[in-house]
Amino acid sequence: MALNVVILAAGKGTRMRSDLPKVLHPIAHKSMVQHVIDTAHKVGSDAIQLVYGYGADKLQASLGEQQLNWVLQAEQLGTGHAVAQASPHIADSDTVLILYGDVPLIQQSTLEALLAARPENGVAILTVNLGNPMGYGRIVRTPCEGQEQGKVVGIIEQKDATAEQLLINEINTGIMAVPGKQLKAWLSRLSNNNAQGEYYLTDIIAMAHADGVAIDTAQPQSAIEVEGANNRVQLAQLERAYQAREAEKLMLAGANLRDPSRIDIRGDVTVGMDVMIDINVIFEGKVTLGNNVTIGAGAILIDCEIADNAEIKPYSIIEGAKLGVAASAGPFARLRPGAELKQDAHIGNFVEVKKAVIGVGSKAGHLAYLGDAIIGDGVNIGAGTITCNYDGANKHLTVIEDNVFVGSDTQLVAPVTIGKGATLGAGSTITRDVGENELVITRVKQKHLTGWQRPVKIKK
């Protein structure tokens, strides 16, 4: 029995006031529909049917390389009509899980509970109880022996409900698990004879009851899981809810957040114990923080690994980089892809490192560019040092061996190797290899011109 997931993503989202299809609007730097697709994979989907309509070119540009079966809904005639477009791709033996591309916070655990609640050859509906159910379809039940809440007999939409039914506060989320054979039969019997003139997917529940099919329900841990976004205000509310949930996960895993409401998590963050994260930090991609790591205010960390006791000082950007034990970067440092700081290495303010290894205990405190370089242990890089790695066509390597002292304002024109223990005088331009323990100075001889007068500004 295969799990066949149908994701409804055909809507334009007029209230978003955007040329972008609604489901492509982002939560945590990832489209809403991508969140849903990822969760579908987590619950073990064997196939995913993506029902699309508006903005097909943009949807396919965003999602096209994934294993999806694209199902066109040329006209938006209701949720039942949307699911019916996927019928040719549903086997009789499938369990069909119906999800929505604009409901991005649905959790794996909730869907697993829904699937577990589905009776054999029956239907499971995800419902939630709301204090104010206005606008939602209501779950209609009748008394049944052995069922405290009663037996589900149907779902009635808001516009079609009686005054009595409007008092019901258990609402339909639209998410359900249905047997494939029966689903296809029920879809073929749908009618649009209702206030909206649409084919309601919810009508299949009354059909299931009439056919004697068992119906059960499950509920999410939080109602926010089943909230959709129809405008940018709701989108922002979902973003805040997502960030609050992710911040809570970090704190439960051992991180101290200076202010949990001022952190942005846009990927997968793994933390050790006693991690300290200051305000306005952004995480993107896959980020790993070891024990006792400190992240300063305003830092941005993208796809990086930070070892135990390391420190990222305020307003530093760390992307595709690794920091070893007790290494530090910043404030205002930039580590680009391929940068690696070994144990106790330090990169200070306004230093940029790209595709370079900084050895154990080595440091570049201020105003330097270190690109395409291998720097040994115990090296001091003076302020203003530049590895000149690009000749206009190709990149070249600079090698600085252990215990080298590089004076301020030094240019190292690659390819070049500086031997162990060498000293480079301030202001030097190094174009040839330097031997071990050599002192190299390439400055022009200093001149003293007595009696020299500064230019005087010409009055106009």
Swiss-Prot record:
UDP-N-acetyl-alpha-D-glucosamine binds at residues 8-11, 22, 73, 78-79, 100-102, 137, 157, 172, 230, 336, 354, 369, 380. The keyword Cell wall biogenesis/degradation applies. Its main location: cytoplasm. Residues 233-253 are annotated as: Linker. Its cofactor is Mg(2+). Mg(2+) binds at D102, N230. Keywords: Acyltransferase, Cell shape, Cell wall biogenesis/degradation, Cytoplasm, Magnesium, Metal-binding, Multifunctional enzyme, Nucleotidyltransferase, Peptidoglycan synthesis, Repeat, Transferase. Acetyl-CoA binds at A383, N389, Y390, S408, A426, R443. Residues 1-232 are annotated as: Pyrophosphorylase. One of its GO terms (molecular function) is glucosamine-1-phosphate N-acetyltransferase activity. CDD domains: GT2_GlmU_N_bac, LbH_GlmU_C. It is found in: Cytoplasm. Binds 1 Mg(2+) ion per subunit. InterPro entries: Bifunctional_GlmU, GlmU-like, GlmU_C_LbH, Hexapep, Hexapep_transf_CS, MobA-like_NTP_Trfase, Nucleotide-diphossugar_trans, Trimer_LpxA-like_sf. It comes from the Bacteria. GO terms for biological process: cell morphogenesis; cell wall organization; lipid A biosynthetic process; peptidoglycan biosynthetic process; regulation of cell shape; UDP-N-acetylglucosamine biosynthetic process. Pathway: Nucleotide-sugar biosynthesis; UDP-N-acetyl-alpha-D-glucosamine biosynthesis; N-acetyl-alpha-D-glucosamine 1-phosphate from alpha-D-glucosamine 6-phosphate (route II): step 2/2; Nucleotide-sugar biosynthesis; UDP-N-acetyl-alpha-D-glucosamine biosynthesis; UDP-N-acetyl-alpha-D-glucosamine from N-acetyl-alpha-D-glucosamine 1-phosphate: step 1/1; Bacterial outer membrane biogenesis; LPS lipid A biosynthesis. Residues 254-460 are annotated as: N-acetyltransferase. Pfam families: Hexapep, NTP_transf_3. Its EC number is 2.7.7.23, 2.3.1.157. SUPFAM superfamilies: Nucleotide-diphospho-sugar transferases, Trimeric LpxA-like enzymes. In the N-terminal section; belongs to the N-acetylglucosamine-1-phosphate uridyltransferase family. In the C-terminal section; belongs to the transferase hexapeptide repeat family. Homotrimer. Catalyzes the last two sequential reactions in the de novo biosynthetic pathway for UDP-N-acetylglucosamine (UDP-GlcNAc). The C-terminal domain catalyzes the transfer of acetyl group from acetyl coenzyme A to glucosamine-1-phosphate (GlcN-1-P) to produce N-acetylglucosamine-1-phosphate (GlcNAc-1-P), which is converted into UDP-GlcNAc by the transfer of uridine 5-monophosphate (from uridine 5-triphosphate), a reaction catalyzed by the N-terminal domain. This is Bifunctional protein GlmU. It comes from Shewanella baltica (strain OS155 / ATCC BAA-1091). The lineage of its organism: Bacteria, Pseudomonadati, Pseudomonadota, Gammaproteobacteria, Alteromonadales. The gene is glmU.
